[in-house]
């Protein structure tokens, strides 16, 4: 896993890459999820992501970044604190945060702006399998000037329009 350099310092070796590749290959649905994210990205013009909780952080498992020059660019595998819309959905369903869960159940989504980065906003929804077990959160994110009173409900509608496809995929993993 680790390699010692000639100067005596250590760094991650190829074993880490192999382990990560094995982990990722266990998610055979990744291609299908990316296809859905790509469709969401095309409809909204914003970046789309699929996030899961990893301890006290959130990790972006799958991502399609917007093709716009002004986009919110994140690389798959990146971890962040549990804030913004994605973090709040994860907290609502993994920490049993009833206040957040009630908000999501009432509106269907969480919207935040400027929580992690000043100019970035996001809309996130929970993703469930056919047994209604929480699996992840799916979101759109981008520059907050593109998230208005008119566009936020449209982004939610787009996300929710793909929830049945996700539900079916997540039930087969």
Predicted segment positions?
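Conserved small/polar residues in nucleotide/adenosyl-binding loops
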Residues: 1-5
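Short loop/turn microsegments at loop-to-beta-strand junctions
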Residues: 7, 48, 122-124
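Residue-level recognition of short loop/turn positions
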Residues: 7, 55, 107, 130-131
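Amphipathic alpha-helical effector-binding/dimerization core
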Residues: 11-96
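Short loop/turn motifs at secondary-structure junctions and domain boundaries
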Residues: 42-43, 114-120
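Juxtadomain coupling helices with adjacent low-complexity linkers
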Residues: 97-102, 107-110, 118-119, 136-173
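A short, hydrophobic, proline-anchored segment that marks a local hinge/packing element in signaling
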Residues: 123-131
């Amino acid at each position: 896993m680790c390699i010692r350099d000639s100067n005596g310092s250590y760094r991650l070796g190829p074993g880490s890459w192999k382990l990560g590749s094995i982990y990722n290959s266990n998610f055979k649905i990744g291609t299908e999820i990316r296809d859905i994210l790509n469709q969401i990205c095309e409809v909204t013009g914003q970046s789309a992501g699929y996030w899961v909780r990893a301890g006290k952080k959130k990790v972006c498992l799958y991502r399609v970044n917007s093709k716009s020059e002004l986009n919110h660019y994140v690389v798959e595998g990146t971890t962040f604190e549990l804030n913004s819309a994605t973090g709040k959905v994860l907290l609502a369903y993994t920490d049993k945060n009833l206040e957040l869960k009630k908000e999501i159940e009432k509106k269907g989504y969480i919207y935040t702006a400027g929580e992690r980065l000043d100019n970035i906003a996001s809309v996130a929804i929970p993703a469930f399998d056919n047994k209604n077990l929480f699996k992840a959160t799916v979101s759109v994110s981008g520059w907050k000037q593109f998230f208005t009173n008119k566009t936020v409900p449209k982004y939610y509608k787009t996300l929710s329009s793909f929830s049945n496809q996700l539900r079916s995929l997540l039930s087969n993993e």
